[in-house]
Design a protein with these regions (language model features):
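Glycine- and acidic-residue-biased ligand/ion/polar-headgroup-sensing regions
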Residues: 34-46, 51
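Ligand-binding loop in jelly-roll beta-barrel domains
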Residues: 68-90
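A cytosolic small-molecule/anion-sensing beta-strand core signal
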Residues: 42-43, 59-60, 78
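Short beta-strand segments in beta-sandwich/barrel cores
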Residues: 17, 26-27, 44-49, 63
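A short glycine-rich, His/Asp/Glu-containing loop-to-beta-strand
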Residues: 1-28, 35, 87
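Short acidic-glycine-tyrosine-enriched beta hairpin
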Residues: 52-69
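A generic "binding-loop/recognition-motif" signal
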Residues: 14, 23, 34, 54, ...
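Short, surface-exposed secondary-structure edge patches
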Residues: 18, 38, 53-57
Length: 90
């Protein structure tokens, strides 16, 4: 059972990051070249912005899948628990 935050798995194929964001907290725009990203909210609600043009509201049971070349930023609309899976493209 994964309970700690930060990078919880990091090997040659995948990185898994567990994040906890307080309401109103943001993640600045960045990208992950060479990776396919799967972004899922376990608890709470966030808005994910891709390339500063597309907005995706995410709640539990929803997964956003996108190319790591895209620039992502995030804003927590409620206190949120998030898992991000960064899979190496082959």
């Amino acid at each position: 059972v994964i309970t700690e935050h930060g990078q919880v798995v990091n090997n040659q194929d995948i990185m898994v990051v567990h994040l906890h964001l307080k309401e109103g907290e943001t993640i600045a725009p960045h990208n992950h070249p060479g990776r396919q990203i799967f972004f899922t909210v376990v608890e709470g609600e966030v808005e994910v912005y891709l390339n500063e043009e597309e907005t995706y509201p995410l709640v539990p049971k929803k997964v956003l899948d996108f190319d790591g070349e895209a620039r992502i930023s995030v804003k927590a609309l409620k206190e949120s628990d998030i898992f991000v899976y960064l899979v190496v493209k082959r």
